[in-house]
Amino acid sequence: MDDASTLIDVKEYPDTEVQKNRVLTLEEWREKWVDGKIGFHQEQGHQLLKKHLDTFLKGKNVLRVFFPLCGKAVEMKWFADRGHCVVGVEISELGIREFFTEQNLSYSEEPIMEIPGAKVFKSSSGNISLYCCNLFDLPRVNIGKFDRIWDRGALVAVNPGDRKCYTDIMLSLTRKGFRYLLAVLSYDPTKHPGPPFYVPDAEIKNLFGSTCNIHCLEKVDVFEERHKSWGIDYIVEKLYLLTEK
């Protein structure tokens, strides 16, 4: 694993067992949207993505970009406006509808025949498709392969016991020459149960190391006042670029 030089010294906690059995249900995630408990949403977009956008896109046009657990991420509109094709998956129908409404985008919806009760929402422009379903049901649908994956708030939200299955699905969606941008969080997992969950370097290497080159682009202190209620006194975001070995 190749680490970028940084002034931030991040303590790694080898004992991550404290969170390994933590489980949030799909209904609990839906309730967070209904109750407006979406502190993870960034109205101005993700600053590290903006900073490293050229590294991520590498000058390519008309890419297929996948957003796992997309919520109403404003970056989906950014990529679509640049001519890329965006596909996302999100369990909250409310989150998806809010995305289209807040971005002033007209859209259509239709059932996903392979997944009972699921729907796909498509922008009228045709270059944004958001699947409202359980991410782990997604392999039942042929959504194609992707040139880029922007994983922010996804791996850190997946129940720790599901990470291997999640990673297998993500990698199954990649095209040759893919670039996968991954944002994770470091904090003391003995003080906060998650989500977002603590994902150490060793876990990333374990999940992606056999198939991907792993490069840490940046580490940033993202501690805010709201984090005090979590019982922690620091939180660091790490941005990784994963590429094909």
Swiss-Prot record:
Q: Which residues bind substrate?
A: 40
Of the GO CC terms on this record, one is: cytoplasm
Summarize where S-adenosyl-L-methionine binds, as residue positions.
29-40, 69, 90, 152
Write out the GO MF terms. Answer: S-adenosyl-L-methionine binding; thiopurine S-methyltransferase activity
The answer to whether UniProt assigns keyword Cell cycle to this entry is no
Gene Ontology BP, a term: methylation
Q: EC number(s) in its UniProt entry?
A: 2.1.1.67
Known catalytic reactions: S-adenosyl-L-methionine + a thiopurine = S-adenosyl-L-homocysteine + a thiopurine S-methylether
| Domain of life per record | Eukaryota
**Enzyme type, top EC level:** transferase
Establish whether keyword Ribonucleoprotein is in the entry: no
Residues with the modification N6-acetyllysine, per the entry, are 58
Q: Where in the cell is it found?
A: Cytoplasm
Record-linked PANTHER family: THIOPURINE S-METHYLTRANSFERASE
Q: Family, per the entry?
A: Belongs to the class I-like SAM-binding methyltransferase superfamily. TPMT family.
HAMAP family recorded: Thiopur_methtran
Subunit note: Monomer.
- Tell me what this protein is called: Thiopurine S-methyltransferase
Species this chain originates from: Panthera leo (Lion)
